[in-house]
UniProtKB/Swiss-Prot annotation:
Function: Could be implicated in the processing or the export process of the subtilin lantibiotic.
InterPro entries the UniProt entry points to: LanC, LANC-like, Subtilin_biosynthesis_SpaC
Annotated family: To S.epidermidis EpiC and L.lactis NisC.
Protein name, UniProt field: Subtilin biosynthesis protein SpaC
Bilayer-spanning residue ranges: none
GO process annotations (BP): peptide modification
Entry-linked SMART domains: LANC_like
Pfam family, one: LANC_like
């Protein structure tokens, strides 16, 4: 079978998914089934949150926006408009509670932009979102400077790295540009050294009381340093680097990027010729001044592990015009694709679709087709999860404690069918909207 035929089949599968998702009542019925509510340890898995980009309507809007951009005569924008109307009603009823990318205003704004046909429509909604950001983000930045750091202060999921990547779309808007500068200055300050238990450490140190779970609080009594793209310093690296590449610069920005990138390299673990990264470096490991003695990481994914870290290194290398960093990122991505570990889902966050988007991003950043064959392999892995008897086509798979991976019926961008669909479209046709901004790409 010729590749063109395969491509048409894969795109048609995404279109069929989009047709099935068009019935909102059916979506709610499926995602809210009892079996979808699980926990990993003390962390509950959230199958649906209507206003959240991670698990709700904004991601669905992105899918229809992207489909319309590729197939403008097929009516996908009409379905997207219906969903955006539902989303606006949900906001009116429940309000906005966070400016973040994956739970709040920035993600909603980005979804509206993806449907807007290059700002032709929905400018009123986008303006309202931006006004909300202009009101809330400065208050948060002031609060951050008055206490110890939380991951959700700076990360892409809940923090200002995600918001900043949204603001990069508004270079001509003075208010949004000024807000972006304030965030960049905060991220630079985050790299200044602080004193913890008599030890000088980087300012992105997360104290014990600000860990996500009680288990982590007990495991890291002196705190730690997060190394994942979703919650760690690769996120700020990506944002600071993207801004620099776009010509947006604040004092200390280059030094901040370099300091964080060097930290990633210093606390990597070498196995033969490949580098690995744990999700977390403990305070004690930092004190010893060396990487951990044993490779101990959870997976090779967008959220944690080699792919996300390598994306950050390549972005840093391009921003700093440092070919060594670019080469380290590219080479270790190659090693990763030849030996992917801990991945058993087709999704974005910790699945094959997320890896695929990073490979595409690195190709675009470098202007080289480093991963042409590897992208075909990743796409084949994603399609191997397609279930023609499942209404949304692709399950999310999660590994519960003591269990094998179980299929879950998720729809959202991070862990659901929408993220798989958008990823496949990008790998087949390229991206015509800005949905990948959510991933720091």
């Amino acid at each position: 079978m010729e590749r063109g035929t395969v491509s048409r089949i894969e795109v048609e599968i995404v279109k069929e998914m989009a047709r099935q998702i068009s019935n909102y009542d059916k979506v709610l019925e499926i995602v809210n089934q009892k079996d979808n509510f699980r926990s990993i340890g003390e962390v509950p898995l959230i199958p649906w949150k209507s206003t959240a980009l991670s698990h709700g309507i904004p991601g669905i809007c992105m899918l229809y926006g992207e489909l319309h951009a590729h197939f403008p005569e097929e009516g996908w924008d009409d379905i997207g408009h219906q969903y955006l109307s539902i989303l606006v009603n949900e906001i009116k009823e429940k309000g906005l509670h966070t400016p973040s990318m994956f739970s709040g205003a920035a993600g909603i704004g980005l979804a509206a932009i993806c449907l807007s046909q290059r700002f032709t429509y929905y400018n009123g909604l986008i303006s309202d979102i931006n006004e909300y950001l202009a009101e809330t983000v400065p208050q948060l930045l002031t609060e951050f400077d008055q206490r110890q750091v939380c991951m959700s202060d700076y990360d892409v999921i809940e923090g200002v790295s995600g918001i900043a990547n949204y603001l990069l779309l508004f270079q001509e808007d003075k208010a949004m540009g000024d807000l972006l500068i304030d965030i960049l200055k905060y991220l630079v300050r985050l790299t200044e050294d602080i004193i913890v238990d008599g030890e000088k450490v980087p300012g992105w140190h997360i104290p014990s009381q600000h860990q996500f779970t009680d288990i982590e609080k007990k495991a890291y009594p002196y705190g730690n340093f997060n190394m994942g793209l979703a919650h760690g310093i690769p996120g700020p690296i990506c944002v600071l680097s993207s801004a620099l590449i776009q010509g947006i610069k604040v004092k200390g920005q280059e030094a901040a990027i370099e300091k964080m990138a060097n930290f990633l390299l210093e606390f990597s673990e070498k196995e033969q010729d490949s580098l690995f990264w744990k999700g977390i470096i403990s305070f004690e490991e930092y004190q010893y001044g060396s990487p951990p003695n044993a490779v101990n990481f959870s997976r090779d994914a967008w959220c944690y592990g080699r792919p996300g870290v390598c994306l950050a290194l390549v972005k840093a290398g391009k921003a700093l015009q440092n070919t060594e960093l670019i080469n380290i990122g590219v080479q270790n991505l190659r090693y990763t694709i030849s030996d992917i570990r801990g991945i058993f889902s087709p999704t974005i966050c910790h699945g094959y679709s997320g890896i695929g988007q990073i490979l595409l991003a690195v190709n675009l950043l470098t202007g080289q087709e480093y991963f042409k064959e590897e992208l075909q392999e990743i796409k084949q892995k994603i399609m191997s999860y397609y279930d023609k008897d499942y209404i949304f086509g692709f399950h999310n798979y999660e590994s519960m404690e003591g269990e094998e991976a179980v299929p879950l019926q998720y729809v959202g961008l991070l862990d659901g069918a929408v993220g798989v669909g958008l990823g496949v479209l990008n790998m087949e046709l390229g991206s015509k909207t800005d949905w990948t901004k959510a991933l720091l790409i």
